[in-house]
């Protein structure tokens, strides 16, 4: 089957400078893909003109006169900017013109507009944001929620686990992913009441529930999926990103300390590059907004051309393998049992 991806070409810190070249790269890799670029036609065409190998016959441009800025309040993005590139791109999914939408724009606005236009799936109380975090196994641990829901009830967390279970099966090809519940300890007696009740509910499902996991388990790859509320998830995500940047800076600083350490850096270059590749956050770019009646992928706002390509890849795999339909079917089965 062919896959059509709608791209908010104006979103993120870099806009068309990143989104359009990344789209062209992706089209060269996948002959079964068509792309809809939404935004300022003049700016989009200027970048396309610099990409002579771009398969123009598989690119459609749709004009949008407004842009959702990274610091725009949700109310302005949702109610006032009705011709924004983000909104028009999401509408393409709503109308069936595209199978998925990818945006590097404002996360809060993307969730709000997507929820308003696409609505949530039957049986899903709240959408959640899920993404993969690098682990020592080199496979990535899928974690959710990452900020959409600061406060959650036990049933919300169970639904997050159910949606992530399908997503990992579809996108990562793991037939029976293991699921961990983030807690302050592995013991069932630990945690607040929400976590304790969630643990009990998850044990009653047919999911491959491992049990409670701690923060270090995320990076060890103890489970394929880690579930938590959006407040905790966002703190973990930002803390891990900050730690990675700090360690990278410290290593660079130490190797530049003297001529001897610079020579050591040359000797250690190969293993260092291997480690860098395994923990490169760009390779894990592309958070999925789960629970909506359409596939929405959130790329990091600062994503470069290389990273944005991975967000497109995630949208492609999710669409090609009917992720949204399979999540919907899972909730139909759940409600009838």
Curated annotation (Swiss-Prot):
Main subcellular location of this protein, as a coarse class: cytoplasm
GO molecular function: phosphate:acyl-[acyl carrier protein] acyltransferase activity
Alphabetical keyword list: Cytoplasm, Lipid biosynthesis, Lipid metabolism, Phospholipid biosynthesis, Phospholipid metabolism, Transferase
Pfam family, any one: FA_synthesis
Catalytic activity: a fatty acyl-[ACP] + phosphate = an acyl phosphate + holo-[ACP]
GO BP term, pick one: phospholipid biosynthetic process
InterPro entries: FA_synthesis, Phospholipid_synth_PlsX-like
Cellular localisation: Cytoplasm
Cystine bridges: none
Keyword flag Cytoplasm: yes
CC terms in the record's Gene Ontology section: cytoplasm
EC number: 2.3.1.274
Described function: Catalyzes the reversible formation of acyl-phosphate (acyl-PO(4)) from acyl-[acyl-carrier-protein] (acyl-ACP). This enzyme utilizes acyl-ACP as fatty acyl donor, but not acyl-CoA.
PANTHER family in the cross-refs: FATTY ACID/PHOSPHOLIPID SYNTHESIS PROTEIN PLSX, PHOSPHATE ACYLTRANSFERASE
NCBIfam families xref list: plsX
Family: Belongs to the PlsX family.
Protein name: Phosphate acyltransferase
Species the sequence originates in: Polynucleobacter asymbioticus (strain DSM 18221 / CIP 109841 / QLW-P1DMWA-1)
